Design a protein with these regions (language model features):
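N-terminal Rossmann-like NAD(P)+-binding domain of SDR-like oxidoreductases, especially those catalyzing
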Residues: 1-183
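Substrate-binding strand-loop-helix patch
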Residues: 188-191
């Protein structure tokens, strides 16, 4: 048995309409993952949670990134613990954006965690990350341990916070929890 809670918001869901491809046997509920009563009803009788809800955009709605992506995750754990729900596992959808650009080494072998790419470089068509002050170029990308996180936008910051909330709350309360770092999940049926 599968239950889905979704707000059906634009632009992911054009017209706010439930996708026609959903199997009719799915227990579909429309609602906001940040609403306690809605979330509690959605969790009733559930033994595994796949928390895929996320706000992603480049608009300066900074607080919305955290309320949807982090607060809703914390709410799931809060309800599981407070209501003693029989949830056996929680899986949250994170993102490659939680890592930022990853780890580089400069020409002198020093580790570099770069910040945002410079607008002036991008306007000139320079896509490679450039050395910063005190760094010898060129920079060479290094395989990056997943514990190295340096997110560069609100979405990435909220996803690393979501990961930490899920993994730490899961550990604290004995709820097996996993954060999956997806990469560019877009296109038809992305939701």
């Amino acid at each position: 048995e599968v239950r889905v809670l979704d707000s059906l918001e634009e632009p992911v869901h054009r017209g706010g309409v439930k996708p026609a491809y959903l199997d009719e046997r799915i227990d579909f509920r429309r609602g906001d993952v940040r609403d306690e009563a809605t979330m509690l009803a959605a969790l009733d009788g559930v033994d595994a949670v796949y928390h895929l809800a996320a706000f992603q955009d480049y608009l300066p709605e900074f607080s919305r990134f955290f309320s949807v992506n982090v607060t809703s995750t914390a709410l799931i754990y809060e309800l599981i613990v407070r209501e003693k729900l029989p949830v056996r596992k929680v899986i949250v959808a994170s993102s490659q954006a939680a890592l930022g650009e990853g780890l580089y080494r400069d020409a002198d072998g020093r580790a570099v965690l770069p910040g945002l790419r410079r607008d002036e470089d991008l306007k000139r068509g320079v896509w490679e990350i450039q050395p910063g002050p005190g760094q010898a170029g060129p920079l060479a990308y290094q395989p990056t341990d997943e514990t190295v996180a340096n997110p560069q936008n609100c979405y990435g910051m909220s996803k690393i916070a979501e990961e930490r909330a899920a993994l730490n709350l899961g550990r604290m309360y004995g709820i097996p929890s996993v954060a999956m770092r997806y990469s560019i999940v877009q296109g038809p049926r992305q939701s």
